[in-house]
């Protein structure tokens, strides 16, 4: 078979690169125009999504170097290998084993029927497809299509979905999980939760806690059940304190090691193994009280970073402004029709704060955790938007 002789060719920013990706753009453009002709979407959505579908062509190589997000090449190569040979790349399989995040991401993104998967940007168009399908699914819950569309024009969503990364899959799965959980579709919610166990274990943990709180504790019903859940969480935390601290300390040290720079210029884990051993003890959390105290101290920084004194390019102030606006939007949704008094919204926000607090504890590299913050925050923002909808049953109580 010809696929036995598959080798990866990096087309870079050549003419062939743009021809391949224009074909992928054209396929998605045809799909959105077809839906417009069927009157399934309005003219604003047509124009917006055509622009959104075009962004991968102007992000990689044109605006920023794809090597700034080097993971793209790993996912793209794995997808190409799976399609060409039916097997994983040797380095991926030997390094991560079977059923790893890279292979799993490549398999899911690879199911999108695009004309080709020839370059590092091809998977970005698969991400765009999943985002668009999510928009179509959500649209039926809202009377105002244009208002929903605005949430899909958030710059970070456009940016991260314009690259061959797993962030978009995590956002889509988390968002669909949250909406189905709010709608009491527990089995369907569990189906969308399961892939996160491989794609993003931290996100799985946060949302699984939400699942338990709602299904077993019924914490979204009233003050007493919510309080019972919080007390249960505190008691369970102290019972499993050693195990929880072991996991938190492992991740704190791992993130610190990943971003470590030694005095001789060496970086990451190799440098940490040589020079960073003495810093590990300072990073370790001694108790859950210590963890809570440090999380509270770091939480404001986590929500508003990157901070002005760390701005090194034009994207940093834009990301900071976006983070402030998204927080404002979430608060405004909470104030809408006194939603902040509703225990469905209170539970949703409580889980968001738990996830944010844990990330604030683990935070090391700002660039990495700006991505993590958006991946966590955006699904909860859409969940709040769904709850604030005037047609939602919770607002009628």
Task: Label the model's feature ranges.
Residues 2, 49, 341-361:
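Transmembrane alpha-helix segments characteristic
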Residues 29-35, 122-143, 328-333:
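Transmembrane-helix motifs of polytopic, lipid-linked glycan transferases
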Residues 41-45, 135-156:
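Transmembrane-helix signature of polytopic, membrane-embedded enzymes
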Residues 41-91:
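Extracytoplasmic loop-helix module adjacent to an early transmembrane segment
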Residues 71-117, 297-298, 302-303:
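Short hydrophobic/aromatic helix or loop-helix immediately within or flanking a transmembrane segment
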Residues 138-145, 176-188:
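Membrane-interface transmembrane helices that cradle and orient dolichyl/undecaprenyl
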Residues 162-168:
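Short acidic/glycine- and proline-prone juxtamembrane loop motifs at membrane-interface regions
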Residues 205-335:
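Alpha-helical transmembrane segments and terminal signal-anchor/GPI-anchor hydrophobic tails
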């Amino acid at each position: 078979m010809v696929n036995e002789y598959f080798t990866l060719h990096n087309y870079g920013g050549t003419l062939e690169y743009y021809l391949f990706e224009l074909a992928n753009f054209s396929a998605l453009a045809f799909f959105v125009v077809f839906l417009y002709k069927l009157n399934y979407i309005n003219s604003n959505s047509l124009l917006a999504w055509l622009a959104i579908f075009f962004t991968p062509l102007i992000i990689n190589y044109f605006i920023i170097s794809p090597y700034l997000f080097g993971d793209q090449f790993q996912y793209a190569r794995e997808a190409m290998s799976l399609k060409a040979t039916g097997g994983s790349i040797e380095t991926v399989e030997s390094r991560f084993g079977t059923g790893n995040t890279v292979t799993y991401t490549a398999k899911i993104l690879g199911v999108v029927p695009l004309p080709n998967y020839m370059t590092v940007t091809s998977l970005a168009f698969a991400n765009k497809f999943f985002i668009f399908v999510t928009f179509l699914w959500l649209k039926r819950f809202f009377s105002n299509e244009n208002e929903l569309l605005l949430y899909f024009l958030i710059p970070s969503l456009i940016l991260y979905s314009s690259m061959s990364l797993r962030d978009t899959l995590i956002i889509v799965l988390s968002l669909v999980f949250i909406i189905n959980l709010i709608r009491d579709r527990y089995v369907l919610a569990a189906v969308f939760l399961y892939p996160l166990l491989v794609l993003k274990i931290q996100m799985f943990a946060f949302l699984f806690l939400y699942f338990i709180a709602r299904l077993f504790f019924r914490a979204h019903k009233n003050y007493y059940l919510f309080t019972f859940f919080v007390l249960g969480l505190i008691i369970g935390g102290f019972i499993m304190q050693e195990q929880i601290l072991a996991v938190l300390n492992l991740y704190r040290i791992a993130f610190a090691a990943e971003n470590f720079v030694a005095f001789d210029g060496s970086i990451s884990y190799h440098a940490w193994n040589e020079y960073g051993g003495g810093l590990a003890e300072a990073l370790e959390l001694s108790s859950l009280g210590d963890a809570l105290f440090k999380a509270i101290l770091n939480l404001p920084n986590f929500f508003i970073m990157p901070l002005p004194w760390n701005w090194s390019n034009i994207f940093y102030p834009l990301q900071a402004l976006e983070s402030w606006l998204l927080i404002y939007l979430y608060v405004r949704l909470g104030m809408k029709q006194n939603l902040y008094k509703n225990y469905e919204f209170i539970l949703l926000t409580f889980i968001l704060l738990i996830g944010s607090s844990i990330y604030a504890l683990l935070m090391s590299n700002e660039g990495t955790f700006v991505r993590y913050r958006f991946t966590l925050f955006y699904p909860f923002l859409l969940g709040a938007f769904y709850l604030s909808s005037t047609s939602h049953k919770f607002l009628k109580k």
